[in-house]
């Protein structure tokens, strides 16, 4: 079973994440940041992963540390759950619309962390999350999950753009980690991801 749990405690945050790649899209998410909970719930439902996040952060200083550290821990728990990646699809791309907004995500779950992010936000999303933190969350996840991601978002509503990104990321990760080869091989000419 492709599951993992990681706890991380620093002077800024205390985070526990339980994660299953072979889930049904169920989540229990408490970050202390309601809009971020909503985005992670959208990611969970559309990835079909099961995700439990319990986070306490120094929110009196702002959401930065909490959002960044959740990205770090979620990337780490993803890597542990994936293991060697035997039989996975590895590559996936998806386009997800949300009303006037559109997010495109292309992934390689191949052990090489890299992010190309195109798109902008007009200001703090829902007045709470500074726009640069959306990209920073994905950077933190990608560095720790060792995934290459190309992400492009356009539209008018910052809420819709952000939600389309989280949904597209979830759908693409689900497709890339789906076991499609029954030969037990790692999908790499190197023999490892």
From Swiss-Prot:
Example of a GO MF term: imidazoleglycerol-phosphate dehydratase activity
GO CC annotation: cytoplasm
Cellular location(s): Cytoplasm
Protein name: Imidazoleglycerol-phosphate dehydratase
Species of provenance: Methanospirillum hungatei JF-1 (strain ATCC 27890 / DSM 864 / NBRC 100397 / JF-1)
NCBIfam families in alphabetical order: PRK00951.2-1, PRK00951.2-4
Keyword Lyase: yes
Top EC group: lyase
